Amino acid sequence: MATTKSTTPRRKAAQSAQERPAAQGAQFPLECPKPRQMHPSEAVVIVREISKDAVKLFVMPKPSAVRSILNETFGPLGWAERRYFADSRLWCAVGVFNPYMRDYCFKDAAALEGKHPGSPERWKEETSFVAAAELWGVGSDVMALPSIVLRADQVPIAGIQKPGRKPNDPPQVVGYKLASAPTVDKFLRNPDTGEIISVQFVDKEGRKATWEK
């Protein structure tokens, strides 16, 4: 008696794990675009302490310049920021978009402490943002600078006076200030590492002063 041949297709043998093509996965550590170095005009000079003999300066990136570099490096939609209070301090988190996570990866930093000019609230807002962006490499070359001390023979320091208690009393010196506020004129960098090893300052009168690491 004739037998009927089955028309049911045979299943293809399952591929082993070694035979299957490997899925394209993320390679760790993930590569991240490297921000460029900061220009001298993108830094701001802040007076921390001053006496008749010297002035202590703090050089930091301008927040507007940090935003520009973030846009250049990651794109306007490639980064984000958020703020919150913790431990009685204002914190800022700067996030960079991660295509594998399809979300932003955030790094957090608190506002810088110490003496500062102007509004305390603005100082906290700006320095927490700059410090968080530094964790992504933006402005890290400038933020790596230590406090810079310039002598009175390098920058003009003027006394702040107030009248004496009596009409015939000589004026009293109650503090000191820079006769002209300096700005950053030039950076000198290590050719191998890019580290800033010297800063040249200039004031409105064109007087220049140089600090070397």
Q: Language-model segments: which ranges?
A:
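Flexible, active-site-adjacent loop/turn segments at secondary-structure boundaries
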Residues: 28, 58, 140-143
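Positively charged, aromatic-enriched nucleic acid-contacting surfaces
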Residues: 64-213
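Strand-helix-loop interaction patch of compact alpha/beta domains
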Residues: 33-87
